Every structure is written in structure tokens, then in C-alpha cells.
């Protein structure tokens, strides 16, 4: 990757954040009575982003045992919207007469294009934000401005500029008492909640490990006639402005657990990474492996690794080592330092956390309760992953404060399929890729 491809776009964030907060705050604080008057009323939902995760979240919303109705859908691509509508409708039909949720999205409430979210959000009480994460900040801002409750998928940004926008909007969401749940579902997973409640058993946490190692994800090949912007939008996982690299899009789950149990965020990071296996033209500009050493304010260190390499061993887990014991997260177990079990969660009792997060969100909305304010933590855990990416791309020690205030903005100035993409391939068809020791931040 050339330096110019990932340069810092310096912005006056004090001015920008103040203007943004003022604009969002200027929108009226919507009372419960204005948009939802009681437990027997329909809770109207708009789905923004109709890919796999948007489809899954829509089904989970409809399965929440509340009177939920999907009334609008929005996506950049018509075929993705149509697939989502078909699949959600089929799942609802499979639930049979016992289904309480419903879908009512006629043609006039199916919106396509980069601006589709602006047309769908006003029609709903709750919005599901499930586009590629590069769009999350602008969609979250708009939903907060319009006074909507929100479920938004992780990560909530792909660069520090986006993190700043989410943090500014999160403050306004709290003022408006808008419930916001972020899809870091381990916070809603029974075994993790039980481990968190008993974490003091291991004494002071001195070190941590986190893994997301597996084969990787899909590839969507370039098709004839696609503009560069359309191709990147279709194959979004492999472009940093849209995905954030897999350390951000996927490994954020593990990093978030570490932050949660630690009760704080890292102060600096250093690491390494690269592309050894996944390095064809269709693999864009992201790495296939990252290793990051995160330092926390109390001196404890997290050793973090994520890898996308077919045929290698798989592991998705977190481990905490304390002065008196260890927490083995995936196993739901706490042991002493010699391996003796001190606590074991009964995994047979575990509910589906993807469903639980929707059950709890929609139950709160149905009761007129303000219970969830996940956006700030979602932004800071997103920034944790971005900090690691900045360290692996550059090969340098990256300070948290400098990184989050860097002004790094990877996004295009214009969103349109015929607009210039933020990064372009060279004459050989390959995209520029970060080079540790050369790439600067």
C-alpha cells in the first residue's frame, strides 16, 4: 500500500463534532407517546442493509415475542433487498400461526441506492443498521437525529473519523433516551454474563489472550460492466474503507470481551501482519493475519491474534490470567492457576445470544423503558480494533490518543456508483497493500 492510499485526512474534529452534535440535538427529543404508545401497539422496524446480517437481524427482531412489524427496507442493491424480503418472509411463514411478528413492505417502501436509508428511517420506530460497517456512522447519525431506537451491527466504523462521529451521536442518543444495542452479542450471552459476574475469583487480571483464527470468508468476483465503486461495494469485505479489515470486522468480538472484563481500553499497541495466503486480485487490500500486543493502563498486556488461512487450525476464544486463576471464556469455565475448576457454566442452558439481544431490546421498547446505551462502548471497541490495524499496517507503536484523534478518514467524498472509489487497482489489477515500516499514519 502506498502512503498516499492511507494518508491522514486531517479534520478539525472539535469544530466538526460540535457542529454535528448541535445538528443532531436540534432534532426534537421524541417522547414514547410520539412514536409508541403501549405494549399492544405495533413496533415498526426499518431494515437498513439487506445482506446476510440484515436478514438475520430482521428475523431475530420478528422472533422477539413482541408485536414487531417490518415496514421498510433499504439497500444499495435491489437484488440484495429482494433476497432479504424473500428470506425473511419465508422464515416468518415457517414460524406458522404462533408468529407474533409480521412483515409489510410493499413496493413503495422498498428503497434502493446510497440514499435509501434517508427514505426508510422516517417510517419506523426502530432501525436495524446492518450495511457494510463503513456506512455505520452516517446511518447512526441519521437514526439518532430522527429519534429512533437502534440495533446496529458491529463494528460501528472503519476509521477514527467514523469513531468520532459515532461517539458524538451516542451522546445525543443518551440525551434523547434512545435505546441502542450494538451486535457485540457476547454481552448478551448467558455464559459470558456469568463469567463476568464471577471474574473477581481470579484476582487481579495480569494478562489476556484473544483469538479469531479460521479459514476466512466469501469472495465476490468482479463482473463485466461493474464500475469500480460497484465492485468494491459487492466485494466489500476486502476493502478497508468498507470493512476495516478482518481484525475490525470480526476480531472486534474478542477485543470487546477483553475491554469489557478489564473495564477499560488499551493505551497503545504494536504488532505485525501481512498477506501470505489470501493475496489475489479479488482479495483487495486487507491482510490475512494480524498479531497485536495491546497495553492497558494498569500494565497488563493482551496478546491478540486473528488469521484467515484455509487449512489452518481454528480457534475463537478469550483467556484471562489473574493472580489467583484463569477465565476460559469459550468453555464457560474458571480455574485456579493449577487447572482446578472453580466455576463451570452449564452450557446446555445457554440461549442464543443473537436472539437474546433482540428479545431484550424489543421488550424494553414495548414497555417504554430506556435500558440500553451500547454505542459508546461499541465505538471504543471498534477503535481498539482500528488501533491494532494501524499498528500492523505501519509496524509502529501506536498511541491510543493520537490514533483516535488522528483524523484518519478512508471514505470517498461522493457516494455514487459512478463516483471515484477511495482506492483503485494498479495496471496489473492488484490493489495497493500496507507495507509495515513504509506505511505511515
What is the meaning of each model-derived region?
Residues 17, 22, 56, 249, ...:
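C-terminal helical cap and adjacent loop that interface with cofactors, partners, or active-site loops
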Residues 20-100, 258, 438-441:
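N-terminal Rossmann-like dinucleotide-binding module
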Residues 131-134:
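N-terminal glycine-rich "phosphate-gripper" loop used for MgATP/nucleotide binding
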Residues 49-53, 174-182, 186-284, 310-312, ...:
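Predominantly a Rossmann-like dinucleotide-binding segment in NAD(P)-dependent oxidoreductases
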Residues 2-21:
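N-terminal secretory signal peptides and thylakoid transit peptides that target proteins
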Residues 92-129:
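A structured beta-alpha segment of the ubiquitous adenosine-cofactor-binding alpha/beta core
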Residues 126, 137-186:
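Beta-strand-loop-alpha-helix segment that lines the small-molecule cofactor/substrate pocket
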Amino acid at each position: 500500500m502506498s502512503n498516499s492510499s492511507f494518508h491522514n485526512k486531517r479534520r478539525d474534529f472539535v469544530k466538526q463534532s460540535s457542529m454535528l452534535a448541535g445538528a443532531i440535538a436540534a432534532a426534537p427529543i421524541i417522547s414514547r407517546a410520539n412514536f409508541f404508545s403501549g405494549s399492544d401497539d405495533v413496533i415498526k422496524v426499518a431494515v437498513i442493509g439487506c445482506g446476510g446480517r440484515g436478514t438475520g437481524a430482521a428475523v431475530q427482531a420478528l422472533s422477539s415475542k413482541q408485536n414487531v412489524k417490518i415496514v421498510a427496507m433499504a439497500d444499495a442493491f435491489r437484488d440484495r433487498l429482494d433476497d432479504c424480503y424473500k428470506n425473511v418472509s419465508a422464515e416468518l411463514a415457517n414460524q406458522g400461526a404462533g408468529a407474533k411478528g409480521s412483515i409489510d413492505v410493499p413496493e413503495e417502501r422498498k428503497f434502493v441506492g446510497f440514499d435509501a436509508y434517508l427514505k426508510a428511517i422516517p417510517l419506523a420506530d426502530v432501525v436495524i443498521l446492518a450495511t457494510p460497517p463503513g456506512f455505520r456512522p452516517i446511518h447512526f447519525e441519521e437514526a439518532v437525529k430522527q429519534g429512533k431506537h437502534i440495533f446496529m451491527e458491529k463494528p460501528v466504523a472503519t476509521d477514527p473519523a467514523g469513531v468520532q462521529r459515532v461517539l458524538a451521536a451516542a451522546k445525543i442518543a443518551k440525551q434523547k433516551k434512545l435505546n441502542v444495542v450494538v451486535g457485540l452479542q457476547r454481552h448478551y450471552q448467558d455464559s459470558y454474563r456469568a463469567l463476568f459476574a464471577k471474574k473477581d475469583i481470579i484476582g487481579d487480571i495480569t494478562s489476556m489472550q484473544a483469538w479469531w483464527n479460521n479459514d476466512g470468508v466469501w469472495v465476490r468476483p468482479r463482473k463485466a460492466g461493474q464500475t469500480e465503486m460497484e465492485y468494491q461495494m459487492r466485494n466489500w469485505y476486502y476493502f478497508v474503507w468498507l470493512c476495516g479489515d478482518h481484525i475490525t470486522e470480526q476480531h472486534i468480538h474478542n477485543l470487546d470481551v477483553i475491554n469489557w472484563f478489564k473495564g477499560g481500553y488499551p493505551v497503545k499497541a504494536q504488532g505485525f501482519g501481512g498477506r501470505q495466503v489470501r493475496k489475489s486480485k479479488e482479495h483487495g487490500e486487507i491482510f490475512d493475519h494480524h498479531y497485536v500486543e495491546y497495553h492497558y493502563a494498569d500494565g497488563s498486556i493482551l496478546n491478540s491474534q486473528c488469521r484467515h488461512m484455509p487449512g489452518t487450525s481454528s480457534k475463537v476464544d478469550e483467556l484471562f490470567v489473574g493472580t489467583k486463576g484463569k477465565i476460559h471464556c469459550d468453555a464457560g469455565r474458571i480455574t485456579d492457576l493449577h487447572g482446578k475448576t472453580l466455576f463451570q457454566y452449564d452450557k446446555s442452558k445457554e440461549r442464543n445470544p443473537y436472539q437474546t439481544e433482540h428479545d431484550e431490546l424489543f421488550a424494553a421498547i414495548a414497555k417504554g423503558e430506556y435500558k440500553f446505551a451500547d454505542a459508546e462502548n461499541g465505538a471504543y471497541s471498534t477503535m481498539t480494533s482500528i488501533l491494532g490495524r494501524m499498528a500492523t499496517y505501519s509496524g509502529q507503536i501506536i498511541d491510543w490518543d493520537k490514533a483516535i484523534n488522528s483524523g484518519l478518514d478512508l471514505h470517498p467524498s461522493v457516494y455514487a456508483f459512478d463516483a471515484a472509489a477511495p482506492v483503485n487497482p494498479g495496471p496489473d489489477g492488484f490493489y495497493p497493500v500496507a507495507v509495515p515500516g513504509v506505511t505511515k499514519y
